[in-house]
Amino acid sequence: MALNDITSKGIIMRILVTGASGWIGSASVTELIAAGHHVLGLARTDEAAAKVAQLGAEVVRGTLDDIDGLRAAAARAEGVVHLGYNHDFSQMGAAAQTDRAAIEAFAEVLAGTGGPLLIASGTLGLVAGGGVATERDTPNPAVHPRVANAGYTLDLAERGVRSMVVRFAPTVHGSGGDHGFVAVLARIAREKGVSAYIGEGLNRWPAVNRVDAAKLVQLAIDKAPAGTVLHAVAEEGIATRDIAGAIGKFLALPVETIAADRAKEHFDWLGMFFGANAPASSVLTRELLGWTPTQPTLLEDIAAGHYPGK
C-alpha cells in the first residue's frame, strides 16, 4: 500500500515517534503500524534500537538534544508523535528547555504542511481543589515548566501544523513493564512492610491502560483537528486507599493510613503526588475521536500481579 493512500483506517503517513522504545511509545508504535502507518522510531541506545526494530518500525538513531538530527528525522516524515522526555525531577527546567527546542525543530519542518504534531503532557495539577479536570481546562504554568510547551504546541495550529496535546493520566498502567507511580508504591510497600495511603485516602487518581493510551495516540494522529487537547484517561479517579488496598492484598501486607505530615518520610518524593486529589475526565476526547477504552482497569492490573514491587 502506497504512503498517503486514503483508506478506511485514515491517511497512511510516515510518522516519526520519539520515545519509541518507552512504556507508552512502544505501545503507540504498535498501534500506528497496525493502522497502516510507516513509523520511524527514534532510538538513543543499541538496546532501544533493537526494541524499535522488533516492533516493526524503521530505526532512526538520535537523541532529544540533537536538534539538527531531530530536524532531519522529521523531514523524512509527514507527522511527529513526540513522547520522549527526560523525567529527572532534579533537572525539570533543563528538561523542559530541551523539550521546547525539540518541538520548535519539529514545528519548523511541519509548518504549512498540515501534518500532525502530537506532544505529551499530563492531567496532574490541572485543577486546584480536587475538581474534575477536563480538556477545556488550562494549566497553570507555575505547576511545571513543561506546561508552556503545550501552549506553544497548540498555537502552532496558526502556522499550518495539525498540533495536538495529549494529557496522560498520572498512572499509565499495564502488563509487562512495572512502570510508573504504582510500581514505586508497590516497591515502597514491600520495603516498609505496609501498603499505606494518606489520611482518609479519598483523594483520587485518574488512570489509563497503556494499550488504551496508545490507541488514543493513533486515533489522534488520524483524526484530531489542529489545536486539540485530548485526555488519555480511562478511569476518572480511583481512591488512593483502594490503590493501596489492592497493592496490600496482592503483596499480602497490611494496609494502613498515615498522617499527611508523615507522607514525605514514608513515600519520599512520591508523597506530594500520592496526596494529590486530581480526578480528570475524558468525555470530550471520547466524543471527538470515538475512543473507547477496553483494557483492564488499574485495580485489575494490580490484582493480576503486574506490580510485584521488586
What are these language model-derived features?
Residues 296-310:
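Amphipathic terminal alpha-helices
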Residues 151-175:
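Conserved beta-loop-beta element that borders a ligand/cofactor-binding pocket
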Residues 147, 173-183, 191-192, 219-230, ...:
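Glycine/proline-rich active-site loop of Rossmann-fold NAD(P)-dependent oxidoreductases
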Residues 11-14, 195, 214-270, 277, ...:
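Mid/C-terminal beta-alpha module of Rossmann-like enzyme folds, strongest
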